[in-house]
């Protein structure tokens, strides 16, 4: 078996041709494929993060085992569950001007929730864009999950301001949003640590997927023993 994880956009990249090419390669390599888009928020992760999960089972094992995608949890965590007692960690502050503007944005709000004159001056050329503006001056809410944790804490079109303070999330806060344990160590400078966290698969989502892989292998082992006994 194999597991392949990627962003949901892979399904539509180049009008679907990229993923179709990959599926063709997997088929020629002798694998039967199953796929599903999973949202980490439904698997114990306080973050909206959709990922395409592709499972491959070798053709000669089809019929001897199967893979079932994990079911959604009954409780979906929010930022209140992970931020209020989060240990301190390295981070990157906003400049003084951006900090003062973010102080005007309410939790759960974004650029439309402040004085249009201030928003327009901040957004500059982005003000006239037809789309791609919902991430500008975006502030998280304790009562909602985080948006997708990214590799950089303060890009203008993908901002994620802390709900209680006018600053980006720290590395450790992002790690909590990815459900890393607090004793997990990240390496390198602050920028490198942000990238490690942002590129990771959320721990709780990975665990749910892996449990089902173990179950599939247990089924295969049991069927193999039965065949040998016969």
Specify the residue positions occupied by each region the protein language model found:
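Conserved Class I SAM-dependent methyltransferase catalytic core
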Residues: 1-48, 53-57
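S-adenosyl-L-methionine-dependent DNA methyltransferase catalytic core
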Residues: 25-28, 51-196, 200-230
């Amino acid at each position: 078996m194999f597991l392949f994880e990627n962003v949901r956009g892979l399904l539509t990249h180049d009008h679907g041709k990229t993923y179709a090419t990959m599926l063709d390669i997997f088929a020629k390599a002798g694998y039967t494929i199953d796929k599903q888009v999973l949202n980490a928020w439904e698997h114990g992760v306080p973050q909206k993060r959709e990922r395409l999960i592709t499972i491959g089972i070798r053709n000669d094992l089809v019929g001897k085992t199967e893979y079932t995608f994990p079911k959604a949890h009954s409780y979906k965590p929010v930022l209140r569950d992970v931020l209020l007692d989060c240990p301190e960690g390295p981070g990157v502050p906003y400049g003084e001007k951006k900090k003062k503007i973010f102080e005007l944005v309410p939790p759960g709000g974004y650029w439309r929730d402040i004085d249009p004159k201030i928003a327009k001056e901040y957004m500059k050329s982005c003000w006239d864009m037809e789309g791609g503006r919902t991430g500008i001056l975006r502030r998280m809410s304790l009562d909602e999950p985080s948006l997708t944790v990214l590799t950089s804490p303060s890009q203008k079109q993908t901002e994620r301001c802390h709900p209680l303070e006018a600053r980006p999330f720290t590395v450790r806060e992002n790690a909590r949003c990815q459900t890393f344990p607090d004793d997990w160590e990240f390496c390198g400078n602050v920028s490198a640590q942000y990238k490690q966290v942002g590129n990771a698969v959320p721990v709780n989502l990975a665990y749910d997927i892996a449990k089902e892989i173990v179950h599939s292998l247990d089924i295969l082992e049991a069927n193999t023993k039965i065949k040998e006994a016969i």
